[in-house]
Amino acid sequence: MNLPNIDQIKTYLLDLQDKICAALAQADGSAKFTEENWVREEGGGGRSRVMVKGAVFEQAGVNFSHVSGAALPASATAHRPELAGRSFQALGVSLVIHPNSPYLPTSHANVRFFIAEKPDEDPVWWFGGGFDLTPFYGFEEDAIHWHQTAYNLCQPFGEQLYSRYKKWCDDYFYIKHRNEARGIGGLFFDDLNSPDFDTCFNFTQAVGDGFLDAYMPIVARRKALCWGEREREFQLYRRGRYVEFNLVWDRGTLFGLQTGGRTESILMSMPPLVRWEYNYQPAADSAEVALYRDFLPVKDWLAAGEHH
C-alpha cells in the first residue's frame, strides 16, 4: 500500500484553486478575486478568495484550507471511535458560485482529504468531494452536459462509479423539510480510501479538474440571455433554499462551525441577496413551475440525452 503524500495533495489543491479562479475571472471579464491568507490558532490555515459584484458573477468564493490539530473534536470521533486520540490534518478546496443572471445556475464543488495519525499505527485517511448544480430556470441541454461530464470522468475508474456517486449526491443534497432536491445533483463521494492512495487521489483530481469542464460551457451558453425583475425575484426566492440547506443540513457547514473553523470562509457559500415569501406557489404552466416539474425530481439525465 502506498502511503499518502500530503505535499503532493497540497500542491494539487493550490494549483486547482489558481486554475478555477483564473477561469472564473476570465469569464467574468470585469471583477477580480481578492485573496486573504489566514492562520488557524490550533494549527494550519488557508487561502480564501472571493470575487464580488462582477459582470457575470454576483459572488464567487474559492477556498483552500489546510488545518491540523493534536486531537480531533468529539463531533468527529462520535461515529468513528478509532479516530480518538489521533492527530489529524484536513486539506481541501471548496467553492460556491452565485451568478447575477437567473439563467445561470448556482454551482458548488469540493475536493478534500483527511488523515488521522498515531505513532506506530497505520494512518487512517480518506478522500471526499464532488460537484452539484442548482439551476433556477433549467435547460435540458445543460443538465445533460453536466451529468455527461460527470459520467465521463468516472468511467476510467469503474463502470458503477457514476451511478453510485450520482445517487449519493441526489440523496445528500435533499432538503428534507421542503421535500425537495436542492438542484439537479452531480457527484458526491466520501470515505474513499480503496483500492490504494494513488487511485483515490487520481479520481479526486479527475473530479476537481472536471468541474470547469462541466460548468464553464453552461456559463458561456447562457450568460448573454436577457432577464428582468420577474426572473430575479424567482432567483432570490430559490436562493433561500440554498441557505436553508446549508444552515440546517450540510455536514461540512455544521462541522466547520462546531469545530471553531473560520466562520467567514465557511459562510462564504451564502448568497449575497436572498428573499423568502410566505406560501409561494408558481403559476401553472409558467417558466417557474418547470423547475419543480422537470428539473428537481431525481432523473436519469444520461437517458434524457439519448432521446435527442
Curated annotation (Swiss-Prot):
Major place of residence: cytoplasm
Gene3D superfamilies listed in its UniProt record: Coproporphyrinogen III oxidase, aerobic
PROSITE patterns per the UniProt record, alphabetical: COPROGEN_OXIDASE
EC number(s) reported in the record: 1.3.3.3
One term of GO molecular function: metal ion binding
Pathways per UniProt: Porphyrin-containing compound metabolism; protoporphyrin-IX biosynthesis; protoporphyrinogen-IX from coproporphyrinogen-III (O2 route): step 1/1
Site positions (Important for dimerization): H177
GO biological process: protoporphyrinogen IX biosynthetic process
Domain of life: Bacteria
One Gene Ontology term, aspect cellular component: cytoplasm
Name this protein carries in UniProt: Oxygen-dependent coproporphyrinogen-III oxidase
Organism: Yersinia enterocolitica serotype O:8 / biotype 1B (strain NCTC 13174 / 8081)
